[in-house]
């Protein structure tokens, strides 16, 4: 079974248990004869995907209990296997969604870590810097690189901590593993979105035929 999660920068694939990533240009050249079950948040690719006969869009099959307007299919898929907890998908944006008794209570969005860097560099050339991923969140910074890093990482940490209360935390996405390290009982699951997609196919076995 070949699954594909298409974002704005990359398309991530799971081929049985083999995970691989293509950038969007590579994805447009990608050819495969078997059925490809996908979700897509990239508006520019919608027409292209409609013309690919072996690409099956899973989005219409997700029945998700939420009153959130315009919730992205990637966020729905990431939350779909979680009954209780907070789901953090840390990519080009960081999305935080709160689930209780399989009901989506709401969520919020932050810039991704790489985009914080861009924001700082736009403010001033003096704020163009790499982040110190080892910066302590328990001591006030004494140099610019640490000050920028502290502002980003502590801000993200406190918002997630406040949303989580005592709920389990589930992290996914490119920076998910890094952010999960700030929390004692966090679970990092690189394949969380794919688990949601697999659950949909299991609920709709006719899709396989």
UniProtKB/Swiss-Prot annotation:
Protein name, entry field: Type III pantothenate kinase
Cell compartments where the protein resides: Cytoplasm
Family of this protein: Belongs to the type III pantothenate kinase family.
Alphabetic keyword roster: ATP-binding, Coenzyme A biosynthesis, Cytoplasm, Kinase, Metal-binding, Nucleotide-binding, Potassium, Transferase
Function: Catalyzes the phosphorylation of pantothenate (Pan), the first step in CoA biosynthesis.
InterPro entries assigned: ATPase_NBD, Type_III_PanK
Entry binding sites for ATP: 5-12, 92
Cofactor(s) needed by this chain: NH4(+); K(+)
CDD domains according to UniProt: ASKHA_NBD_PanK-III
Organism this protein belongs to: Campylobacter jejuni subsp. jejuni serotype O:2 (strain ATCC 700819 / NCTC 11168)
Main location: cytoplasm
Binding site for K(+): 89
């Amino acid at each position: 079974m070949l699954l594909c999660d298409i974002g704005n920068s990359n398309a991530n694939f799971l081929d049985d248990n083999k995970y691989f990533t293509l950038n969007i240009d590579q994805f447009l050249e990608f050819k495969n004869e078997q059925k490809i079950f996908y979700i897509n948040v990239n508006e520019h690719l919608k027409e292209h995907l409609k013309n690919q006969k072996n690409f099956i869009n899973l989005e219409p099959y997700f029945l998700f209990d939420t009153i959130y307007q315009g919730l992205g299919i990637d966020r729905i898929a990431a939350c779909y296997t979680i009954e209780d907890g907070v789901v953090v998908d840390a990519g080009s944006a960081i999305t935080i969604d709160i689930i209780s008794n399989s009901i989506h209570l709401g969520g919020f969005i932050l810039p991704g870590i790489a985009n914080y860097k861009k924001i700082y560099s736009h403010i001033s050339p003096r704020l163009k810097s790499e982040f110190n991923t080892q910066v302590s969140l328990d001591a006030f910074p004494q140099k610019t690189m640490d000050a920028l890093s502290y502002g980003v990482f502590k801000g993200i940490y406190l918002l997630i901590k406040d949303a989580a209360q005592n709920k389990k935390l589930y992290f996914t996405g490119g920076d998910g593993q890094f952010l999960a390290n700030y929390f004692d009982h966090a679970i990092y699951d690189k394949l969380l979105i794919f688990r949601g997609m697999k659950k949909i196919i299991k609920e709709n076995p006719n899709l396989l035929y």
